[in-house]
Amino acid sequence: MAKTIQAIRGMNDCLPTQSPLWQKLENTVKNVISAYGYNEVRMPIVEETNLFSRAVGEETDVVSKEMYTFDDRNGDSLTLRPEGTAGCVRSCIQNSLINRDEQRLWYMGPMFRHERPQKGRYRQFHQCGVEVFGLNGPDVDAELIMMTARLWRELGIDKHVRLELNSIGSQEDRADYRTALVAFLEQHIDVLDEDCKRRMHTNPLRVLDTKNPDIQAILGDAPRLSEYLGEESKAHFAGLCELLDAAGIEYTVNERLVRGLDYYNRTVFEWITESLGAQGTVCGGGRYDGLVEQLGGKPTPAVGFAMGLERLVLMLETLELTDVRRSVDVYVVTAGEGTMMAGMKLAEQLREAISGVRVMNHFGGGNFKKQFKRADKVGAVVALVLGENEVADNTVVLKDLVGGEQETYNQAEVAEKIAALI
């Protein structure tokens, strides 16, 4: 027997038993975002490697350790996208979407990072991202946070997530702070692990995000970034907090929140849950006002967020919020000469008469017992039975698979009866 081929480690199939919950999540996300007037954009999953090196940062873990990079047959270095913002910015610049007008966009799809697979973290994972270009006020920052808060309510998980905010200021604000932070870290060099020692010289703000408890202990005495913010950054963050207060959205200011990608400035935020065991981020974002110019476009303010769909699916499963629409409403059972085609015609009539109805025909033969067993297995609530007599009389037997009652109807009126049952 030939050796079976397995999926790549950390890249999972979404099976028929799982896809209804995914569809429910994706549809809810799309409906919430669309309610704010945002438009979908679809980008390739493969980009030039240089795009991510320039946008995300050479020294970030994503670029230095986690990207799937390869040379194509022309010798060009290409990368499976590890995140969506850089590709969205590239698309907007290339297609002149932000030269004269603001843009409010969203996208959804697979991303790739070569990480150690674990619960809620995979090598192929799915994100939904929302990006706004051309608006620089705290009002649009607040709208994005309000959008995510609405999504949590729609999904029923709003009591299981909490919001953390920070302002990391402008590039100029951070320059003096970096100097002060590095000086502090050098005084505690013996406590730092190798990762933080490296970050101290490449991106010292990332040390604030360490999970090492020994280093976390000394960071309580570290210089505070808020004390180095300029007046514009302070006013922007105060305006955001005021808008969130007015909207009734609770939050915590976490001065160690910096996010893991180099392009952020001013506002950064994360939605965090403890429902998955260890504390985990389900959504994060912030401002990246310099990224468009950095990638060759005109200076353009921008803000956005991304959410991990696998983690949201895990939350829904953990919290037992998995009610989804059944995949089959009506199962058509047939037996006898000429009944198969009659059953297929009736199914087509029902699909036209009842918007969204899901009708499955039985194929493969078998007696009524076998066919009803299959109807139960696929979760149908109604079975339609067609024998030779029913075909001759243009009737059909409708059986309620929940209550057990059955009755014979003219085929012309059965759609109305089914619509009342499902």
Curated annotation (Swiss-Prot):
Task: Look up the domain of life of the source.
Answer: Bacteria
Enzyme Commission designation: 6.1.1.21
Write down the chemical reaction(s) this protein catalyses: tRNA(His) + L-histidine + ATP = L-histidyl-tRNA(His) + AMP + diphosphate + H(+)
Q: Name one GO cellular component term.
A: cytoplasm
Main EC class the enzyme belongs to: ligase
Tell me where in or outside the cell this protein is found. Cytoplasm
State any single GO MF term.
Answer: histidine-tRNA ligase activity
Swiss-Prot/TrEMBL GO biological process terms: histidyl-tRNA aminoacylation
Alphabetized, the UniProt keywords read: Aminoacyl-tRNA synthetase, ATP-binding, Cytoplasm, Ligase, Nucleotide-binding, Protein biosynthesis
Q: Which InterPro entries match?
A: aa-tRNA-synth_II, aa-tRNA-synth_II/BPL/LPL, Anticodon-bd, Anticodon-bd_dom_sf, His-tRNA-ligase, HisRS-like_core, HisRS/HisZ, HisRS_anticodon
Database matches in CDD domains: HisRS-like_core, HisRS_anticodon
Q: What's this protein's family per the entry?
A: Belongs to the class-II aminoacyl-tRNA synthetase family.
PANTHER family from the xrefs? HISTIDINE--TRNA LIGASE, MITOCHONDRIAL-RELATED (PTHR43707:SF1), HISTIDYL-TRNA SYNTHETASE (PTHR43707)
Query: Assembly and partners?
Result: Homodimer.
The name on file for this protein is: Histidine--tRNA ligase
Q: Which organism encodes this protein? A: Vibrio parahaemolyticus serotype O3:K6 (strain RIMD 2210633)
* Gene, per the UniProt record: hisS
